[in-house]
């Protein structure tokens, strides 16, 4: 196969993707709108394409770039000379390493001999921390939040105890853009000798320039670590994130090292051994090109667009913005205070917006442990490029709202009634073929098919079925998507 044919096929495959530039996808994509920054990042990645990030003593450029990126992040995020850090492959790895570090340090203190360490966080904390608890054997203690998405500091503080290895707060939370009460929680954690991590993966490179934000970063007493994604509002290619840790001795627990094999001595600061230096080089180049002033200018654009969109959504009868979002993201829910024929279901709204050329992110509701329920919402992430399409986007949001006004949400009972007879009673532990049969039965898997164009019924199904079942079915759906075709 010729090189040109290969590239042509890749271009054809890419044409089926959601657009990564232009502001038409309001999740997953962090577009600065600066073509020269994209070109700089690509050139930097090309220069280090053969470099193995495993060993910064052999490839010394890796050590220099990582040191300079960490230094910039430390200065931006309120750290002092006692703060050290690493560049990871993404927010999930940063979160995993923060939990692993805290767990190992907790074990070293032996405050609860024989106990299972506990990870304490609001229920809105990123799912990466659920993964971390699962991987590293911590009990996950998720605290319910208010209908606004905000968590009470007291609700977290009263659950602290000697078995808590780490408390996590968000700056802001992804689902609702709520800024957790970081100063109060960190102070209480410090008083009990508990590590406190700030997950600023989505906000870390933007909130330093945002208006009227409560203290949230490493300048807050009691904060022991912080994560901030370079591949979000640091505008770097996937995947690059920074994990900052307070105290060299604390941070060394993040590392893995062994000389107990007949090969080369292994020392890994992060989860991976061999890894591409490309995302690091791109992030390093962008940090130097933009500097604080460049990031501030891009954040200002995000803030203007966010303010405009919050005002617009608030003006649409039947919709409401959830809580008081902090940063360039927001969640939109149905306004139950208006008559039923004036209400707008956020999932039908998102589907209608998609049909008109913009992609929003549907979020299911959640039944919390205290019996309260968080409503279904639609999520929007705002980037600098949003400002250039703001008029078109606003017109689409309004027109889509009118198109679905009064259409009731998908009824969970109707969703369950459409399932094959007796399915829920006979499932037990699903094997792969049974899971596939269920997916086919509900129309989610067919030859060449992706997810449905209308996602509201799909989200209603997720909400209606037991969580372990939906998790198993979604696992099968994603696994089948990347299996070799027969």
Predicted segment positions?
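Active-site C-terminal subdomain of aminotransferase-like
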Residues: 212, 216-328, 332-342
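Short beta-strand
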Residues: 87, 320-325, 362-364, 370-371
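Conserved PLP-enzyme active-site core in the AAT-like
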Residues: 89-257, 263-269
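Non-catalytic terminal extensions of PLP-dependent enzymes
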Residues: 1-63, 67-71, 333-486
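Short loop-beta-helix segment that forms the pyridoxal 5′-phosphate
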Residues: 73-98
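Short Gly/Ser/Thr- and Asp/Glu-enriched loop/turn motifs at secondary-structure junctions
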Residues: 81-82, 323-329, 373-375
């Amino acid at each position: 196969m010729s090189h040109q044919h290969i590239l042509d096929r890749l271009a054809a495959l890419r044409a089926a993707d959601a657009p990564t530039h232009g502001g038409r996808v309001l999740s997953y994509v962090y577009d600065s709108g600066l073509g020269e920054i994209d070109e700089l990042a690509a050139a930097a990645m090309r220069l280090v394409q053969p470099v193995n990030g495993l060993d910064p003593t052999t490839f010394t450029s890796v050590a220099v770039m990582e040191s300079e990126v960490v230094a910039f992040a430390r200065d931006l995020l309120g750290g002092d000379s006692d703060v050290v850090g690493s560049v990871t492959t993404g927010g999930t790895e940063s979160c995993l390493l923060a939990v692993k570090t805290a767990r190992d340090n907790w074990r070293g203190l032996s405050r609860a001999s024989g106990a299972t360490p506990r990870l304490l966080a609001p229920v809105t904390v990123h799912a990466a921390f659920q993964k971390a608890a699962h991987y590293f054997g911590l009990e996950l203690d998720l605290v319910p939040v208010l209908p606004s998405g905000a968590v009470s500091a007291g609700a977290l503080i009263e659950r602290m105890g000697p078995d808590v290895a780490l408390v996590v707060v968000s700056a802001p939370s992804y689902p609702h853009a709520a800024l957790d009460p970081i100063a109060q929680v960190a102070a209480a954690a410090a008083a009990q000798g508990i590590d406190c991590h700030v997950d600023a993966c989505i906000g870390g490179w933007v909130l330093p320039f945002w208006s009227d934000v409560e203290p949230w970063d490493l300048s807050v007493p009691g904060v022991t670590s912080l994560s901030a994604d370079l591949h979000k509002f640091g505008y770097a290619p996937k995947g690059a994130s920074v994990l900052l840790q307070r105290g060299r001795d604390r941070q060394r627990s993040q590392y893995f090292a062994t000389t107990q094999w007949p090969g080369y001595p292994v020392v890994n600061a992060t989860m991976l051994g061999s890894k591409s230096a490309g995302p690091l080089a791109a992030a390093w180049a962008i940090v130097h090109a933009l500097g604080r002033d460049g990031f501030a200018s891009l954040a200002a654009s995000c803030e203007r667009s966010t303010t405009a969109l919050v005002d617009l959504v608030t003006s649409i009868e039947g919709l409401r913005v959830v809580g008081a979002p902090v940063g360039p993201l927001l969640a939109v829910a149905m306004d139950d205070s208006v008559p039923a024929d004036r209400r707008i279901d956020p999932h039908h709204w998102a589907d209608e917006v998609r049909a008109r050329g913009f992609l929003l992110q549907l979020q299911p509701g959640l039944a919390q442990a205290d019996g309260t329920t968080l409503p279904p919402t639609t999520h929007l992430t705002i980037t600098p490029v949003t400002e250039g399409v703001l008029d078109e986007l606003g017109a689409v949001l309004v027109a889509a709202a009118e198109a679905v006004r009064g259409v009731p949400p998908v009824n969970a009972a109707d969703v369950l009634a459409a399932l094959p007879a007796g399915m829920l009673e006979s499932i037990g532990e699903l094997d792969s073929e049974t899971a596939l049969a269920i997916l086919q039965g509900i129309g989610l898997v067919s030859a060449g098919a992706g997810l449905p164009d209308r996602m509201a019924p799909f989200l209603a199904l997720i909400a209606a079925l037991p969580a372990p079942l939906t998790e198993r079915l979604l696992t099968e759906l994603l696994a089948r998507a990347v299996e070799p075709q027969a």
